[in-house]
Curated annotation (Swiss-Prot):
Domain of life: Viruses
InterPro entries (UniProt xref): Actin-rearrang-inducing_fac
Location of region: Disordered: 268-319
Compositional bias ranges of the Low complexity kind: 268-312
Protein name as catalogued: Uncharacterized 36.6 kDa protein in EGT-IAP1 intergenic region
Length: 319
């Protein structure tokens, strides 16, 4: 519930900031086209006037264009995340959000610097800032002349007592004349010096919202980096456990194979132990067969026990 409330408030801040920046951007475009609507800053003691509408148009135009792209990209991301699983959601955001967040931070930093410079030089803007189309609303004279250019500084001629023109004022030892104006008064009211408290409070408020948005973007980028590292760690852990399971299965397979080989060797050893008696009987029969062949020749070579050797003196009996 708290996240939803925070998201709604953040959306409201972004919408209000977008509206304010859109107004500033439109006014800056009008100031570039027509100097009556330009934000002019007179350089004190010089004849030149700076049209600040051009850098304002570039800075805030870049902000608006980027945030239009950013909101469209957010819608695309939300649509893809809604139609996909949570894992795909994390991987998609972790992969794509980083570069968009970096660009968003850079754009917010640039616009924040613009507001900081405006607040820092507010006293200078208070004295020398002009917006001719709005300045005319704060004076009751010279309502037809909506401009502030063609500034001329002239030295005061003390020898000549000519009257001062209505479009000139004294500045130290010089006369400052605004050639495009019919009447100029000293310390002339402008939109900036007549609304100083409102302008400075508005600038500080927008700057605070801008800094808050910058903080939100940094927090979101850090969260996305954390989610990316977490997803990578989970992936590495999953691959590690898969590798462990694969090695365990490989060891179990090798163990089973070793058991099968051991059983085969044991069975062959049992067969080898039971075969020697038949080998002995075979050897005995072979020995008997060989003896049957060898015996007659041995008997024929031996003398017969029943015969007597003949004497060289002839056969005779002692008795």
């Amino acid at each position: 519930m708290l996240n939803k409330i925070t998201a709604v408030l953040q959306f409201g801040l972004n919408a209000s900031l977008l509206l304010a920046y859109l107004i500033v951007f439109v006014l800056s475009i009008m100031g570039v086209i027509d100097s009556r609507y330009a934000f002019l800053l007179e350089i004190e003691g010089k004849q030149s006037v700076i049209n600040l509408s051009i850098p304002i148009m570039l800075a805030f135009g870049m902000w608006i264009l980027f945030y239009m792209f950013y909101f469209i990209w957010k819608i695309i991301v939300w649509t893809k995340n809604r139609s996909s699983s949570s894992n795909t959601n994390v991987n998609f955001n972790a992969k794509e959000n980083f570069y968009v967040a970096i660009t968003c931070i850079m754009v917010n930093v640039i616009t924040g610097l613009c507001w900081m410079l405006f607040a820092a030089f507010q006293i200078y803007v208070f004295k020398n800032g002009h917006l001719p189309a709005l300045d005319v609303l704060y004076r009751h004279y010279d309502l037809e002349s909506m401009c502030w250019n063609s500034i001329v500084y002239l030295e005061i001629d003390y020898a000549n007592t000519e009257t001062l023109s209505q479009n000139c004022v004294y500045v130290n030892i010089y006369k400052k004349c605004i050639m495009c104006r019919a009447i100029v008064s000293d310390h002339e009211p402008t939109v900036f010096n007549q609304n100083y408290p409102v302008i400075i409070m508005g600038v500080l408020t927008i700057l605070a919202v801008q800094c808050w948005n910058l903080y939100v973007q940094l927090k979101e980028m850090r969260h996305n980096i954390y989610m990316k590292r977490r997803a990578e760690a989970e992936k590495a852990s999953y691959e590690h456990y898969c590798d462990i399971d694969y090695r365990r299965e490989e060891r179990e397979s090798n163990s089973r194979l070793l058991e099968v080989v051991s059983e085969g060797r044991n069975s062959s050893s049992v067969v080898a132990v039971t075969h020697p008696p038949s080998t002995t009987s075979t050897t005995t029969s072979v020995s008997e067969t060989l003896s049957s062949f060898i015996a007659p020749s041995d008997l024929s070579s031996q003398p017969s026990p029943s015969s007597h050797p003949s004497s060289p003196f002839g056969n005779h009996n002692e008795f």
